Amino acid sequence: MRLKDKLGGKVTIISMGPMQTREAIKKAMSFGADRAILLSDRHFGGSDSLATAYILSTALKKVNETEPIDLVLAGKEAIDGDTAQTGPGIAQRLGFPQLTYVIRVREMTESNITVERKTEAGRQVVEAQLPALITVEKELNEVRYASLPDLMKAAQYIPDIWDSNSLIFDATQMGLKGSPTSVSRIFAPLG
């Protein structure tokens, strides 16, 4: 939202999940987003990171038809899989450069973005042309507080709901059919 405050533009939230995800979307809307889209369908269920990247990138392509995208922000990794593959998968499908593990946006112009990212050796400053996708770490920014009017407005907000009939999807690339990986078991490491 701070990038929007500084540079203008619109913020669209796109999330994939069950209908209960609307509550999380409402919270995000209270911080100043302009629009939200929830991708929700039983056919999306069981999607691994590859299938999830396919579904999200298909939605982003549709948004890009009417509202050109400059920057896609994604979380570093999902809490259920910890694979950190969905953001890079989306970038690859969109043909966008990707900057991962971003902890700070140093500068953004109409054509470029410069960020600071975490690496195993420390920190690195990198630049990419826009449009781009960045996966962000928690320390990227402090969450702003929503004002009471924004909270009240967001509580009434109804996101657009897109299902498998809303876009042209290849059924073999989503859900369990489109997921080459599966979890056979989960266990805590010894020690």
Question: Residues of each region from the PLM?
Answer:
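N-terminal glycine-rich FAD/FM-binding segment characteristic of electron-transfer flavoproteins
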Residues: M1-G191
